Structure formats: structure tokens, C-alpha cells
Amino acid sequence: PDLCLSDEFQAEPKQLSVNFKEVDHVEKAIAEADVILVEPVVQPDYTKSRDERTGELSLTPANYKITREVLEKKAKSDAILLHSLPRMDEVPVDVDITRWSRYWQEAFNGVVMRMTLLALVLGAME
């Protein structure tokens, strides 16, 4: 599938004077990034168990995967890597223990934030 941004999608940031560029490989953009936000390129079918969708496990094109090697060769030492989770194959598990990984903290902070918002909405706190 064509993974380029459509003209329609590019129009809005251009109208807002957002400075962006489109590249065909993460290695071309990662060296400049302070924050690397990764999302699945192809959305898996979550109605099936992981065992049932074994054929889907290699859905991310290699040029869009954030591997440990790419991070070690290209990323800034103080950059952070975020992911909304759950992940498929776009970020291999060996990236979890690198200095860039912040997605587990991101997930924890999201739980705390949702708990706080629920408590506020339900009147348990002011």
C-alpha cells in the first residue's frame, strides 16, 4: 500500500504553517528528532488472538521499523521513544531496555491520568 501522506492530509499542517517533511525511511528523520512517536502502520485485527493472527506479525515495512540498531546509529542520545501500545512489529522488544524507551512510563502515566479524571468526574475529589 502507498504509505505517503495524501495531498489532503498535507494541506492542513501547511495551512497552519507547520514545518514538516516526509521521508521514505525512519533513518532519514530520526537523527533530528527529540521525540520519536511510533504508531502501527497497519492496524491488526484485535478480534483474533495473537496466535490466530500469526500471518500478520510482519506487517510493518522495514523502512518504518524503529530498531535498536537504527536508534544506536542515528538517534540523539537524549531523544525519547513513545508508543501508544499495544505494539506489533514496529518496535522490537529489544528496544525496551534502551535509554530511548519511554513507552512503559507513558502507559503508566496514562493510567494515572485516567484514574484522576474519573475521580474528578465522579466527584470523588475536587
What are these regions (language model features)?
Residues P1-E39, P44:
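Glycine-rich phosphate/diphosphate-binding loop of Rossmann-like nucleotide-binding domains
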Residues L3-L5, R68, F108:
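Donor-nucleotide binding loops and adjacent catalytic segments primarily
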Residues Q10-A11, R50-R53, V95-T98:
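Short, glycine/charged-enriched secondary-structure capping and boundary segments
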Residues V26, T67-R68:
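Acidic, amphipathic alpha-helical patches
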Residues P40-K65:
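Glycine/threonine-rich flexible loop motifs
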Residues R68-D78:
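Short, conserved loop/helix-junction motifs that constitute active-site signature segments
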Residues D78-E126:
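Adenosine-phosphate binding glycine-rich loop
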